[in-house]
């Protein structure tokens, strides 16, 4: 997810195939560096949540080496015992130059996939959530190919593949890097990050995700060719407290 100070992001979809139940709730479980235990698998199961997506893995260089931050079989087994699936999050660390070099290298891409296959086995995962962001739009087709390669390889293990995308906009590195229709054809789910309408650095105060803005974003995404049954709406469980002084604004994030 784009901003690391977001502690939680609740993602929900209504679809006929979602866990064979019709409703799917996914909770992004961000674990801070050094955090050994997650609160999400402690205590009672959260109502309406079917999947936990812990922030465990980072592609840390152009050779495709994956850094394991928090991977835990104990976490997965606790989650399974409570009735959750676990889709571990893997990120490109929002590093556009590194990502370009990685996408240019068939060997590096194969290395990433091989490690993901092993991580899926080692941690008894149900799937992966791909959080690939801040990518050069010139790498758009290579990104699509890479996601397809990941999906084909890991589906042989029975793993679910989802990917995080932004609301369609004119932003090159944050939006136009995604071929939404083509990517939707090769993944199981597409997580639409319906935030931030007004970011922390905004020059005007406003909502993080107002209803009209979110609805418009959903429609734009569907118009790009993403099937409704694959679209997961990502909603922020945080807000901003704005302060205006002499025509300037600053924000404090609350979660």
Label every PLM stretch briefly.
Residues 56, 113-142, 192-204:
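Active-site groove signature of glycoside hydrolases
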Residues 4-13:
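Sec-dependent N-terminal signal peptides
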Residues 63-66, 70, 137-255:
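Substrate-binding surface in catalytic domains of secreted glycosidases
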Residues 40-46, 113, 117, 177-186, ...:
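Mature extracellular/periplasmic domains of secretome proteins
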Residues 16-20:
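Sec/Tat signal peptide C-region and signal peptidase I cleavage site
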Residues 30-34, 57, 91-93, 133-135, ...:
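Active-site beta-loop-alpha junctions enriched in small/polar residues
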Residues 23-29, 50-54, 86-90, 128-130, ...:
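Hydrophobic faces of well-ordered beta-strands that scaffold small-molecule active sites
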Residues 21-116:
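Glycan-recognition patch characteristic of GH18 chitinases/ENGases
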């Amino acid at each position: 997810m784009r901003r690391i100070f977001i502690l939680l992001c609740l993602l929900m979809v209504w679809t006929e195939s979602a866990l064979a139940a019709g409703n799917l709730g996914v909770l992004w479980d961000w674990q801070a560096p050094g955090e050994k235990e997650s609160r999400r698998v402690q205590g009672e199961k959260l109502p309406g949540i079917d999947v936990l997506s812990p922030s465990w893995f980072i592609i840390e260089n152009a050779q495709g080496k994956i850094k394991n931050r928090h991977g835990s079989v104990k976490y997965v087994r606790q989650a399974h015992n409570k009735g959750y699936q676990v889709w571990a999050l893997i990120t490109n660390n929002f590093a556009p130059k590194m990502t370009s070099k990685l996408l240019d290298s068939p060997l590096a891409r194969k290395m990433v996939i091989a490690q993901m296959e092993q991580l899926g086995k080692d941690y008894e995962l149900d799937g992966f959530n791909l959080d690939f962001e801040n990518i050069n739009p010139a790498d758009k087709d290579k990104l699509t190919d890479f996601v397809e390669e990941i999906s084909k390889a890991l589906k042989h293990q029975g793993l679910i593949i989802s990917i995080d995308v932004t609301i369609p906009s004119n932003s090159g590195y944050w939006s136009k890097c995604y071929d939404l229709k083509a990517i939707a054809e090769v993944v199981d789910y597409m997580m639409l990050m319906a935030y931030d309408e007004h970011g922390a650095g905004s020059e005007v105060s406003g909502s993080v995700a107002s209803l009209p803005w979110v609805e418009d974003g959903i429609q734009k995404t569907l118009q790009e060719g993403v099937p409704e049954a694959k679209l997961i709406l990502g909603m922020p469980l945080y807000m901003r407290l704005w302060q205006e002084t002499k025509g300037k604004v600053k924000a404090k994030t609350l979660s």
